[in-house]
A protein has these predicted regions:
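Hydrophobic membrane-targeting segments
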Residues: 2-58
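Hydrophobic alpha-helical transmembrane segments and adjacent short intramembrane/lumenal linkers
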Residues: 156-170
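Lipid-exposed faces of alpha-helical membrane segments in multi-pass integral membrane proteins
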Residues: 23-40, 129, 133-139, 176-180
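Residue-level signature of catalytic and energy-coupling elements of molecular machines
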Residues: 18, 36, 69, 85, ...
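Feature detects long, helix-prone N-terminal segments enriched in hydrophobes
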Residues: 1-7, 180, 209, 213-214
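Predominantly long cytosolic amphipathic alpha-helical stalk/bundle segments
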Residues: 51-159, 186-232
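Hydrophobic alpha-helical transmembrane segments of polytopic membrane proteins
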Residues: 168-186
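Short, membrane-interfacial amphipathic segments enriched in basic
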Residues: 1-10, 98-106
Length: 232
């Protein structure tokens, strides 16, 4: 019962606040909705993709040839690790033709960088929202205090009736700013940690393919040299 009365009191303070305070609260509310939507969306996707990477890496442990890797890639072509494998194998074929493992490693790094860049999409919104929400809360605090001093000047009195509305506006906007900023900052850091974990899995995938491409090129080199000697 007391909790319901407290909620009604807070809502009453928001309703009775001035236009500027309502605008700050409305902005913070929309920022909170956007941050939670982005955070849940990114966390769900990252969890799915990390699980896919673990499964593909487990299958890759059984592979000993590029042909077996190609089979794994074709079976998982609709997943993120499957897409990365297809791209790596495509560049691996070119590396075998040009006999340039350095070029393949550069291309593999570029593929992973592009994937990670896409995975980081929308996450800056969380860090920006955390900073902006804090500043909006501070702005609301200052605005509420100014409002309180204006009422003191108008009423020529510093009693609680005069200053309470301004002080309540200041405290409400401060709390609202923190309620938006803290989860946004926590989500941003946690998502960054998940992206680093995904990066580790993709690098492991790339390293496995790189080793196989290098081994394939090593096997091809003696054969090419033998054909060259025969032609001479």
């Amino acid at each position: 019962m007391s909790e319901m009365m407290g909620n009604n009191a807070v809502w009453g303070l928001i309703v009775q606040s001035d236009f500027m305070t309502k605008m700050v609260m409305l902005t913070l509310f929309f920022m909170s909705v956007i941050c939670w939507a982005i955070a849940l969306y990114k966390l769900i996707l990252l969890r799915i993709k990390q699980k896919q990477c673990r499964e593909v890496l487990h299958e890759m442990r059984k592979c000993t040839t590029l042909q077996e890797v190609l089979q794994v890639a074709s079976e998982n072509k609709k997943t993120l690790p499957g897409y990365v494998l297809v791209q790596l194998l495509s560049h691996g074929k070119n590396a075998q033709e040009t006999n340039s493992i350095e070029l393949f490693q550069f291309q593999a790094d570029s593929i992973i960088d592009d994937v990670l860049y896409q995975e980081e999409a929308y996450t800056p919104v969380l860090t920006i929202s955390a900073s902006v929400a804090t500043l909006l809360g501070l702005f609301g605090t200052v605005w509420g205090l100014i409002h309180a001093f204006v009422r003191i000047s108008e009423k020529q009195s510093a009693d609680i009736v005069a200053v309470a509305p301004g002080i309540s506006e200041a405290l409400i906007t401060t709390i609202a700013g923190l309620v938006v900023a803290i989860p946004a900052l926590v989500f941003a850091q946690y998502i960054a940690l998940k992206i680093r974990s995904l990066e580790h899995s993709l690098v492991s995938l790339s390293d496995k393919v790189t080793v196989m491409v290098r081994m394939s090129m090593t096997k091809q080199s003696p054969a090419v040299q033998h054909k060259s000697d025969e032609s001479i």
